[in-house]
A protein has these predicted regions:
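A short, N-terminal "cap"/entry segment at the start of jelly-roll beta-barrel domains
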Residues: 1-38, 115-124
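A generic structural signal for short beta-strands and their flanking turns/coil linkers
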Residues: 25, 37-42, 59-61, 66-68
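Conserved short histidine dyad/triad with adjacent acidic residue
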Residues: 27-28, 39-57
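Short, charged/polar surface micro-motifs in flexible loops or helix N-caps
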Residues: 34-38, 46-50, 69-71, 106-109
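Ligand-binding loop in jelly-roll beta-barrel domains
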Residues: 35, 76-79, 87-115
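A short beta-strand-loop-beta hairpin characteristic of the jelly-roll/cupin
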Residues: 55-81
Length: 124
């Protein structure tokens, strides 16, 4: 019988890299630069009256509201709710104040309304 060594990575919230974009604050949790190989997870703090940049994400995204409430495509989610957004669906995160946990696949890219494609730095 072969025994495989399993390596578990602890990523503390205090050590998460912080990024700002459009008045929103992102904190990278489980992303490739922190040890994740397939899944990317971060938090986003949405300010009161937050009006996110419209974009399309190349991968499915799951938004889990930790506190407050946000709206995506007319769907308002409060603490404990989740919104699943299929890939290539136009969306903008609005509302707040709120803290949201976002989960997606590694390699996600966003296409902005002007056609510019970006790789969100909080996903790396």
């Amino acid at each position: 019988m072969t025994t495989l060594e399993v390596v578990v990575v602890l990523i503390t919230g205090d050590s998460a890299a912080a990024h700002s974009f459009g008045g929103f604050e992102f904190r990278s949790l489980a992303v490739p630069s922190r040890g994740s190989a397939e899944i990317a997870v971060w938090t986003v703090d949405v300010p009161e009256g937050g009006d996110g940049t419209p974009h399309r994400a190349s991968k499915e995204e799951v938004f889990y509201v930790l506190s407050g409430s946000v709206t995506i495509q007319g769907q308002t989610a409060s603490a404990g709710d989740a919104i699943v957004v299929p890939p290539n669906t136009e969306l903008a995160l609005t509302g707040g104040p709120a803290r949201v946990l976002v989960a997606t696949s590694v390699g996600i890219q966003g296409t902005l309304a002007d056609g510019q494609t970006i790789t969100p730095p909080w996903s790396l």
